[in-house]
A protein has these predicted regions:
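Solvent-exposed, non-transmembrane regions of integral membrane proteins
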Residues: 1-641
């Protein structure tokens, strides 16, 4: 996929020969060399004892030594593969990988321009590279968000972002690339930040290669839930990385003396000063992320035993929240500053109304939505509040700049529109990640999960799972939920129909979570169902269920009880109130019936009536069971002693 997109981009680059002039030669040299290196990954040739690549077309009998493969008709004994993991059977996984790999492939073009510029000692490529760099950042960002959408819908990581090393591997190149775009803009206007632009455009591609090494080498096996295992190509992957890293940095250091920039210092009130600050903040953010992600690499190289953070998400969040605050503010004020210098009077005049509107909107957000995240202390909670204000400021200030300063001209508003989109995403992340609420708190004291599920399943916390019985309305937070029925389709996917009814109104809706039979015959995999509102989403998924296709092995636990006595069960007591003799007047005269009149009382004080009995008809004795579905109880009258 990477090689395919690389070929497509290479063909497009070739059409720019007349426009780019001599620059095209250096760019195509790098693009072609990258393509050759990619091609070696799928060659599958042995050079002495070294295997170069792994061919996707190799036959099973050429790779394995199983005796059955010596038979000419061995294919009739080979069954189809198990296919995709059930969690990957999602429409987002059809479009996410192609878009993401297009983003990876596109980082080659800015890198190729940087290499060509260093080789030729020319810096006139900045105008040509900018559209490619913005395209690359846009596509790579889109691919990342598609992956987030998949994680959000499938709830594989408890949300759309979990700071998993494989997620970080795509985010870090994007951060550095965006930093490079901003320093490139500075160079075009002022002739400064040239060295930083070379560094950032080079690193964006090299970090893609490093990310490939991390995810494909198996080194992240203990820290990532969806990294690949060792594919037997570690030496080649490392060589692929070093063959670009060493020459590029060697060439960059060698050419530093030729990268001339004006010696004058930027004014603190200038746009270029704060653009550079923002670029450096993005770069430092990337450094922190990749450093934490690379802990297994450091341990491997230096023989250390540095432990990864116990709470990886918070280890990143406690740093990145301040990055979000700074970037939110800089995207807001940056365009109100002029290149070279800005008068304080003019700046205050332009920024005054955006600040006022931001204060009003922030107050509305805090009042109607709020932030309910106190797990990490008041300091982090305060940072979240500031982050929401900063993101709101970014949206409002850029909207004001677009309509007041640019008079609503879309052609001139690329930066404003981009910043509005980015800060809207930032605001959504801060609000949604800070307001996760569990509706299904289990207050019964009965865990619906097996012990191994409760410990190992990230969605298997017993306190966050309640048992629903068919046809029984159950309290769940702001809603009363009824499990109405379930259906099974032809692909072994079982859908559960759940009716949610708001307690304070008559509003109700249906959700259909499903479970899909695991293709390795190891149980089921859950897919959530969701209800989307403008300000919230409600997710529901099935952690476990009673498979009616299997034999019920539940056994009764006998108890001896007298009238007025009570016995305990896991969630309360069962009292025998009375014994009724032939309570049914319409019963046949030849039959005799005994019915136990019992009261089931739960820990919550809820009472249920139960009437198990025995019926003697002629010489046949029948047991009459009674079920208390809300308490998962089945009562049987066995005998009189």
């Amino acid at each position: 996929l990477w090689s395919f997109w690389h070929s497509v981009l290479g063909l497009i680059v070739m059409t720019k020969a007349k426009k780019w002039g001599k620059n095209i030669n250096g760019v195509m040299m790098v693009v072609n060399f990258v393509q050759v290196c990619l091609a070696t990954m799928i060659v599958g040739l042995y050079i002495f004892d070294f295997k170069l690549g792994s061919s996707p077309f190799i036959l099973l009998r050429h790779e394995m030594t199983w005796p059955i493969l010596s038979r000419p008709d061995y294919l009739q004994f080979v069954k189809d593969g198990t296919g995709l993991n059930t969690t990957l059977q999602n429409y987002w996984m059809v479009i996410h990988p192609p878009v993401l790999f297009l983003g990876f492939a596109s980082t080659t073009i800015p890198f190729a321009f940087a290499v060509a510029g260093l080789l030729k000692k020319e810096n006139n490529w900045m105008d040509s590279v900018l559209p490619w760099a913005t395209f690359s950042a846009g596509i790579l960002g889109l691919g990342i968000m598609m992956g987030d959408a998949w994680a959000y819908e499938s709830l594989n990581f408890g949300g759309y972002w979990a700071w998993d090393p494989v997620e970080n591997a795509s985010l870090v190149p994007w951060l550095v690339l965006v930093a490079g775009i901003h320093t490139c803009l500075i160079y075009r206007k002022k002739g400064t930040s040239l060295k930083a632009t070379y560094l950032f455009f080079g690193l964006s591609f090299l970090l893609v290669l490093y990310s490939t090494f991390l995810t494909r080498s198996g080194i992240l096996g203990d820290t990532s839930v969806h990294a690949f295992t060792d594919l037997g190509m570690n030496a080649q992957l490392l060589g692929y990385l070093l063959i670009f890293v060493i020459p590029y940095f060697g060439l960059l250091i060698y050419r530093l003396k030729d990268l001339k920039e004006p010696q004058e210092e930027d004014e603190i009130s200038s746009r270029e000063f704060w653009m550079l600050v923002g670029s450096l903040v993005l770069f430092l953010s990337a450094v922190v992320i990749i450093a934490i992600t690379s802990i297994p690499v450091f341990n491997k190289i230096f023989g250390t035993k540095i432990a990864p953070p116990e709470d990886p998400a918070f280890a990143h969040n406690q740093v990145q929240i301040f990055v979000a605050i700074i970037i939110g503010i800089l995207t807001a004020i940056g365009q109100y500053l002029k290149f070279k210098a800005t008068s304080a009077e003019n700046f205050i005049k332009n920024i005054k109304w955006p600040l006022i509107v931001t204060a009003v909107l922030s107050a509305i957000i805090f009042y109607f939505i709020g932030i309910a995240y106190e797990e990490k202390g008041i300091g982090y909670l305060g940072a979240l509040y500031v982050g929401v204000v900063a993101a709101t400021f970014g949206i409002v200030a850029n909207a004001f700049y677009w309509f007041n300063i640019l008079k609503g001209k879309l052609k001139s508003a690329a930066a404003s529109v981009g910043h509005i989109g980015f800060t809207m995403v930032l605001l959504g992340i801060l609000i949604s990640s800070s307001n996760k609420t569990v509706l299904s708190w289990n207050t019964t004291g009965i865990s619906p999960l097996k012990e191994d599920n409760a410990k190992n399943n990230p969605t298997g916390n017993p306190r966050e799972n309640i048992t629903l019985f068919e046809g029984v309305e159950t309290d769940m937070g702001k809603y009363m939920v009824t499990y109405q029925r379930d259906t099974l389709d032809g692909l072994d996917k079982r859908f559960f129909e759940l009716n949610f009814k708001e307690k304070k109104s008559d509003h109700s809706f249906l959700l259909y979570p499903d479970v899909l039979k695991n293709n390795k015959m190891e149980g089921f995999s859950a897919n959530p169902s969701s209800k989307h509102y403008w300000n919230k989403d409600i997710f529901v998924y099935v952690t476990s269920f009673q498979d009616h296709s299997e034999e019920d092995t539940t056994s009764f636990k006998p108890h001896q009880i007298a009238i007025g006595d009570s016995i305990f069960y896991s969630n309360g007591t069962i009292k025998l109130d009375n014994v009724l003799i032939n309570p049914n007047p319409k019963a046949a005269s030849s039959s005799n019936e005994l019915v136990l009149q019992m009261t089931v009382t739960s820990k919550e004080g809820l009472k249920y009536e139960a009437k198990p009995g025995i019926l003697l008809e002629g010489m046949t004795l029948n047991q009459e069971l009674d079920t208390v579905k809300a308490q998962n109880l089945v009562l049987s009258f066995n005998k009189v002693v």
